[in-house]
């Protein structure tokens, strides 16, 4: 039998059974291969992700220790989506969202839908309903660890219910994946870290909620606080490192560092200076920073203050950095050693 006739017959049978468009050639529609993205609020992280930001229609996992900047990063993504007219929702399972802080990061509270569910099942059903509507662009679940199964809430404190949360997540993700892709909604799961007992070799760290999220996530970001930013004796922010542990859209294992200032969020001006020095756009001579033979200031904080007062120069540096994004991506990949890659695979 002729292969082409057999294929045509099979395709027409599939379309009769499941509807037109249930199967097609990948190159038939140009839009199929295009990836829409939303900025993370960090220029260096957008470059490290390889596609200019977090991809829409995918599952994202952000995990790390306490007070490392997980929720801050998710709120920045919401703010960036809202700037482009996107509809966003926040499922606050931890009941800990601070609206005042969210507003300072640029989130439009009037157009942010918030839910504070009582159980894990309720949280995931709300998530599924919003995703299926096709009207939501970004949905954040904070956090996986707080998605407590109903059986655990109704039971006694002494009850042992192993694997209950992992089964809940596995079932929910099986149902959600297809809807997320069809609706082009980005779902960000914030997760916490736990320690595995009795691990002799490799990293003892693991994330909550079982292994399902690790498989279904297209992007996994490991965010850590690596130091403090001080103004004289007062701590005003955190130095933060983010590793792209998994990336289905570009090469993974890139690593970036940026500042998170208390009450402001990610310091974009600090990133412009750091990235500019890396590619030679901003010159550093001793403690002095300069751009196009114009001195920005002595010391990083003074240079940041100069850019804050001269927004047009900051915009010029950002444009130049975006044009050098390919070169920067290679630099970011080279920063990560083999040891770090081995450790990432353990989590």
From Swiss-Prot:
One of the protein's GO biological processes: SOS response
Entries under PROSITE patterns matching the protein: RECA_1 (PS00321), RECA_2 (PS50162), RECA_3 (PS50163)
One GO CC term, this protein: cytosol
GO function term, MF aspect, one: ATP hydrolysis activity
Residues where ATP binds: 64-71
Subcellular compartments: Cytoplasm
UniProt keywords, alphabetically: ATP-binding, Cytoplasm, DNA damage, DNA recombination, DNA repair, DNA-binding, Nucleotide-binding, SOS response
Disulphide bond pairs: none
InterPro entries: AAA+_ATPase (IPR003593), DNA_recomb/repair_RecA (IPR013765), DNA_recomb/repair_RecA_CS (IPR020584), P-loop_NTPase (IPR027417), RecA-like_C (IPR049261), RecA-like_N (IPR049428), RecA_ATP-bd (IPR020588), RecA_C_sf (IPR023400)
Main location: cytoplasm
Gene3D superfamilies listed in its UniProt record: P-loop containing nucleotide triphosphate hydrolases
Pfam families found in the cross-reference section: RecA (PF00154), RecA_C (PF21096)
Superkingdom, taxonomy of origin: Bacteria
Function: Can catalyze the hydrolysis of ATP in the presence of single-stranded DNA, the ATP-dependent uptake of single-stranded DNA by duplex DNA, and the ATP-dependent hybridization of homologous single-stranded DNAs. It interacts with LexA causing its activation and leading to its autocatalytic cleavage.
Family statement: Belongs to the RecA family.
NCBIfam families xref list: tigrfam_recA
Alphabetized PANTHER family for the sequence: MITOCHONDRIAL DNA REPAIR PROTEIN RECA HOMOLOG-RELATED, RECA
Name the UniProt record assigns to this protein: Protein RecA
Source organism of this protein record: Bartonella bacilliformis (strain ATCC 35685 / KC583 / Herrer 020/F12,63)
Name of the gene encoding the protein in the UniProt record: recA
């Amino acid at each position: 039998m002729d292969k082409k006739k057999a294929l045509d017959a099979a395709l027409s049978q599939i379309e009769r059974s499941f509807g037109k468009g249930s199967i097609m050639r990948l190159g038939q529609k140009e839009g199929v291969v295009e990836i829409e993205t939303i900025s993370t609020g960090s220029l260096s992280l957008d470059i490290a992700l390889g596609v200019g930001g977090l991809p829409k229609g995918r599952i994202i996992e952000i995990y790390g220790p306490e007070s490392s900047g997980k929720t801050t990063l998710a709120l920045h993504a919401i703010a960036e989506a809202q700037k482009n007219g996107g509809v966003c929702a926040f499922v606050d399972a931890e009941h800990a969202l601070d609206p005042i802080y969210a507003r300072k990061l640029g989130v439009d509270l009037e157009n942010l839908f918030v839910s504070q569910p009582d159980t894990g099942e309720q949280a995931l059903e709300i998530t599924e309903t919003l995703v299926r509507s096709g009207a939501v662009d970004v949905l954040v679940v904070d956090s996986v660890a707080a998605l407590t199964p109903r059986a655990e809430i109704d039971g006694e404190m002494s009850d042992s219910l192993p694997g209950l949360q992992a089964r809940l997540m596995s079932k929910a993700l099986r149902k959600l994946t297809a809807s997320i892709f069809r609706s082009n909604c980005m779902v960000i799961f914030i997760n916490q870290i736990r320690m595995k007992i009795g691990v002799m070799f490799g990293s003892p760290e693991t994330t909550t909620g079982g292994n399902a999220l690790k498989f279904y996530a297209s992007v996994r970001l490991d965010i850590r606080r690596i130091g403090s930013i001080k103004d004289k004796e007062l701590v005003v922010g955190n130095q933060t490192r983010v590793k792209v542990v998994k990336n289905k859209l570009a090469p993974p294992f890139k690593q970036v560092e940026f500042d998170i200032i208390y009450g402001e969020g990610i310091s974009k001006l600090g990133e412009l200076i750091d990235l500019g020095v890396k590619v030679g756009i901003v010159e550093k001579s001793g403690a002095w920073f300069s751009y196009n033979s114009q001195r920005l200031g002595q010391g990083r904080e003074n240079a940041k203050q100069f850019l804050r007062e001269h927004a047009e120069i900051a915009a010029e540096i950002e444009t130049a950095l975006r044009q050098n994004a390919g070169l920067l991506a290679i630099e970011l990949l080279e920063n990560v050693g083999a040891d770090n890659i081995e450790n990432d695979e353990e989590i």
